[in-house]
Design a protein with these regions (language model features):
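Short, solvent-exposed beta-strand-terminating loops
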Residues: 22-34
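Active-site cleft segment of glycoside hydrolase catalytic domains centered on the general acid/base Glu
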Residues: 5-6, 34-140, 146, 161-168
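Conserved, mostly hydrophobic/aromatic
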Residues: 25, 77, 151
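Anion (oxyanion) recognition and catalysis
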Residues: 16, 110, 174-175
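Active-site clefts of carbohydrate-active enzymes
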Residues: 85-91, 121-124, 128, 148, ...
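Conserved residues at the C-terminal ends of beta-strands
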Residues: 1, 80, 154
Length: 186
């Protein structure tokens, strides 16, 4: 891809200078990640799950600290992008390796939040609300002990059904799991 940490710092500073808080979206991939593509970075290809969760945690913490040290007002951090089918090369939310990646990313955010005494919300992000799988995803995360603040959805009206369905899917998450909800990609 053509975005890296230094470019994120530059863009984050511009947004902060304009009075905005910033959402950082870690794809944990060398290129764009979406429901069809969740490839781990090449450097992580031969790692065990223990090594991969450690590098996710370190990478997330180091990147956030770099952004904050540069003066970027980080308000939310997304652990993965459209992660319906996995994250960082791990497949399926019922897979313990997949939820371990989510847990490592969220724990990193919470550690930086605590160390910096700064509220930073941990976000998980999915797509395809029209398939009505969101409660399944939220249950898998809850069962695995993944602690996050915001359940986010992509929403493209052409592909993702009605706004009423999106609202119903997200409201069910709030009612059952007490999570904030957002549409993060429209």
């Amino acid at each position: 891809g053509n975005n890296d940490l230094l470019k994120a710092v530059d863009m984050g500073k511009l947004a902060t200078d304009a009075g905005m808080r910033v959402l950082i979206d870690f794809h944990y991939s060398d290129f764009w990640a979406d429901p069809a593509k969740q490839k781990a970075p090449k450097a992580w290809a031969d790692m065990t799950i223990a090594e991969k969760t450690a590098v996710v945690k370190d990478y997330t913490m180091n990147s956030l600290n770099t952004l904050l040290d540069a003066g970027v007002d980080v308000g939310m951090v997304q652990v993965g992008n459209e992660t319906n089918n996995g994250i960082a090369g791990e497949s399926g939310l019922e897979n313990a390796n997949t939820t371990a990646i989510f847990r490592a990313g969220c724990e990193a955010i919470q550690q930086v939040e605590q160390d910096r005494n700064k509220e930073i919300k941990a976000v998980v992000h999915f797509a395809n609300p029209e398939k009505q799988n969101y409660m399944t995803y939220a249950k898998a995360l809850a069962d695995a002990g993944v602690e996050y603040d915001v359940f986010a959805s992509s929403y493209y009206p052409y592909w993702h059904g009605t706004l009423d369905n999106l609202k119903n899917q997200l409201n069910a998450i709030t009612e059952k799991y007490g999570k904030e909800v957002r549409s993060c990609t429209c």
